[in-house]
Amino acid sequence: MNIIKKYLLLALISLLHLPLFADNNSVNSITLARIVFEELSMPSAIFVGEALPCDFRIYNGTLQKIKDYTVNFYLNDEVVSTYSGENLASGNGYNVSIIIPIPETLKQGQYEFTIGFTKVNGETLETVYKSSKRRTVSIVAEKLPRVGVMEEITARWCGWCPRGHVGMEKLQNKFKDSFIGIAIHGYKDPMYYPNYPIKGLTSYPSCVLNRTGHSMDPYYGTESGIVDNFEKVMKVPATVTVTLDATYNNDSSYIDAVAQIKSLINAEDYSIVFVVTGDDMYHDSQIWKQANYYARYSPSSVLADLKQFAYGEKYGKNPFDYHYDNVVIASSYSDGRINQATLDKLTENGTTEAHYSIKMPTETTLTKGIKYDHVYVNALVINGNGEIANAAKVHVTSNTTGIGSLSKASDAQEVVARYGIDGSRVEDSHKGLQLLKMNDGT
């Protein structure tokens, strides 16, 4: 019986990863797998010669205090810096912020960043214990134009969501063409789009910027306002530039999008997402009205740029009529929230082209609020960390050779445009095959 109890005890110890001797602080008695790097955060790109700011959280999941420890930081398995800490109490986590100097000899390119223990409680480990947390860091030598993206969840039934509209408008006004807003409307909205992934966004309203870090309020941000947060992510160097073209097909049921991505680095882990957004979306039915909890308050009791929603002001009703901008209405995401657009590998100083045909929505509750001359395609280029490396936005134009795009002007048929067989417009009649566009749309 004693033997059975002994083996049962040993089995239990093994399952729980408990040290055999609680008073022994040697490395052998500590299960390194229970010392965890819970978070690892840093910019996805820096310039050549710049230092790399790094934030990480270390958690001591053992039953013993860690008196001291040393970790190495690696880029492509080359040690670039070392950090030493002490006094990690059992069952506690600690946040560490450091600046890692990067050798100027490291050239432009993409590097894998890892972190690993080399010493614990004064003992040097025979084998470096590396964390499973890894990041890709790009080092670039050229400053490229940067476009930042806010992805926000909002809803017309959310009474606090009007401040998200203001936050997005503030970013648009300040950053102009360097800002892209993407508003993902919630369930029961006529603008609800179920295919869009909203990882990390749980409360209404909330947003992410360039898909970096945690979610935040789209108006207050995490510091002194959303503008400060956006300025911070805009400081991260871009590794690519994106140019974009988008046109409707003949009956505006599809949009053909073409993006050209010029890259500073070689990369096989980048992807591209196409998102269609609508501006000035409106319908006079009740289900399009925006809820507004700020209507409970007097103008003097709310912040200056929220006064428009206070009692007695322009939008001081609950609910109120509103024209919505930056609304997601279609994308390259499928029903399973899987991105269907593809991107070939990027080459240093090379250009890669991506094509995608996006189906426009057909649900009448949504389409009756769409203004087809206020529709845009956004191309988001995603790096290996899942963050937006750069983006572009373009107004969707009509297919100039598309027969269905012409409005009927009179009952009598007449030629209003001529095109060559290559689709280019010609000014007058000439010998050879021509495509004629008539005033009745044929």
What is the role of each PLM region?
Residues 140-177:
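Local sequence-structure signature of Cys/Sec-based thiol-disulfide redox active-site neighborhoods
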Residues 36-43, 71, 83-85, 180-400:
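Short, conserved sequence motifs used for protein processing/export or organelle targeting and
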Residues 78-105:
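Intrinsically disordered, low-complexity Pro/Gly/Ser/Thr-rich segments with frequent PxxP/GP/PP motifs
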